[in-house]
């Protein structure tokens, strides 16, 4: 790094661990499922304004919006955006039981601290990392360090993967980048961006896109005494039974798909996965009738460069091979990207990691390369972006579904963001 070590230590001395923990826990305590992020955004706007970092609430639609703050520099350097999201993937919302089963205590919007661990909805994805970026900006301000460029602080709504379909309509189901896309097209831009999504503080600059596909098969409504049970289940007039014959071919395709679409780049591998996320057919209160329609819902992640229509055509080819008449339709599509021109930003963050932890960052875990994040929209809009955020490295803490952070990781992330911000704003060119 070009930044002087003494300057870094001066800034790091202003990182208040107690205040960081307090802010993160306060944010966790505010429920902010997709579509209801306004109270969480306003808490952060108020927190920044109280510390003389100008911030405002950007409404996207009633009840949901973005938090935007700005730490001004001298005006002759690049603008760096820190970005996180306010909505949570796991919560105590009863609808979450549809996919999560029993709700774990750490998924509730009720923060608790046990020794060096903080539990609660969003502490990993993405409220804890977001608070680190705000605390980094506050430490920079308190230190009096001179920055050439501005730092833009953003917490967006509606990053979590959801899409309206069938009876599930309205703001709670509009996700996968709604807030980020609105923000970037309504005046909030930058030269570079650091997306503070959980990565175990690894550094990546590519993320997957995704498509949601609905598959429908048809049968005949039939009173149970008249139901037949053919040996060939694909000939059943029960739509649920008929749909069951599609699962094995789809799973076989999923195995082929991830091998054929694996994407290799400088941060490792991106392996786009396919997941059967839901199946709906019949009426639970009326099992004495054979259902005439059954729907199955699939997400397929996509590597950079893959067109959504090509994935749909792959699914259609699988369905045609089964001999079962089935309809398929896309109901969400976002593109995957690898950032171009992000090398100086990557170097700055690697240097920040070494400065804080006295070692090089670990290689990116493939699964964390293979997720969706709003990084893709930043890159689509021409902003070089990387992803780097704290998440537990201990596999017993279940980083894929757990919501628990080590305080030490939050503090280290905050210090890394301080160091990266100085390096970018004072030593990188504008884009």
Residue ranges of each PLM-predicted region?
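Short beta-strand/turn micro-motifs at beta-sheet edges
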Residues: 14, 201-205, 282-288
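N-terminal helical capping/dimerization or prosegment-like subdomains
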Residues: 2-93, 97-99, 293-297, 311-312, ...
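Short beta-strand segments
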Residues: 83-85, 154-156, 194-197, 216, ...
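Active-site metal-coordination/substrate-binding segment of hydrolases
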Residues: 77-152, 161-163
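Acidic/histidine-rich catalytic neighborhood of metal-dependent amide-processing enzymes
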Residues: 126-209, 429-431
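A structural signal for isolated positions on well-ordered beta-strands in alpha/beta enzyme cores
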Residues: 56, 81, 152-154, 327
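Metal-dependent amide/peptide-bond hydrolase catalytic core
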Residues: 1-9, 18, 90, 218-431
């Amino acid at each position: 790094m070009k930044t002087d070590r003494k300057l870094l230590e001066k800034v790091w001395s202003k990182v208040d661990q107690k205040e960081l923990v307090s802010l993160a826990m306060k944010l966790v305590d505010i429920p902010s499922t997709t579509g209801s992020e306004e109270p969480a955004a306003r808490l952060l706007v108020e927190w920044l304004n109280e510390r003389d970092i100008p911030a405002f609430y950007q409404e996207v639609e009633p009840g949901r919006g973005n938090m935007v703050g700005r730490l001004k520099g001298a005006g002759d350097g690049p603008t760096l955006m820190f970005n996180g999201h306010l909505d949570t993937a796991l919560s105590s919302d009863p609808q979450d039981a549809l996919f999560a089963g029993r709700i774990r205590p750490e998924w509730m919007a009720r923060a608790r601290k046990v020794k060096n661990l903080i539990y609660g909805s969003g502490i990993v994805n993405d409220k804890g990392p977001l608070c680190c970026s705000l605390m980094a900006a506050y430490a920079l301000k308190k230190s009096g360090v001179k920055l050439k460029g501005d730092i833009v602080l953003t917490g967006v709504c509606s990053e979590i993967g959801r899409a309206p379909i069938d009876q599930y309509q309205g703001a709670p189901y509009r996700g996968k980048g709604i807030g980020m896309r609105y923000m970037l097209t309504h005046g909030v831009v930058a030269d570079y961006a650091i997306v503070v999504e959980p990565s175990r503080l690894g550094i990546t600059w590519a993320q997957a896109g995704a498509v949601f596909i609905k598959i429908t098969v048809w049968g005949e409504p039939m009173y149970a005494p008249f139901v037949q049970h053919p040996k060939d289940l694909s000939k059943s007039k029960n739509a649920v039974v008929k749909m069951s014959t599609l699962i094995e071919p789809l799973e076989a395709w999923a195995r082929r798909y991830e091998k054929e679409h694996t994407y290799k780049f400088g941060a490792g591998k991106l392996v786009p996965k396919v997941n059967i996320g839901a199946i709906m057919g019949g009426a639970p209160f009326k099992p004495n009738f054979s259902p005439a329609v059954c729907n199955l819902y699939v997400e397929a992640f996509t590597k950079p460069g893959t067109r959504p229509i090509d994935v749909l055509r792959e699914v259609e080819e699988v369905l045609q091979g089964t001999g079962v008449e089935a309809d398929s339709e896309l109901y969400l599509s976002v593109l995957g990207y690898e950032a171009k021109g992000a090398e100086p930003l990557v170097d700055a963050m690697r240097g920040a990691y070494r400065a804080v932890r006295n070692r090089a960052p670990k290689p990116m875990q493939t699964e964390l390369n293979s997720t969706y994040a709003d990084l893709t929209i930043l890159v689509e809009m021409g902003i070089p972006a990387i992803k780097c955020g704290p998440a537990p490295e201990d596999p017993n803490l279940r980083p894929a579904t757990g919501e628990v952070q080590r305080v030490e990781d939050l503090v280290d992330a905050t210090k890394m963001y301080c160091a990266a911000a100085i390096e970018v704003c004072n030593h990188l060119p504008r884009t």
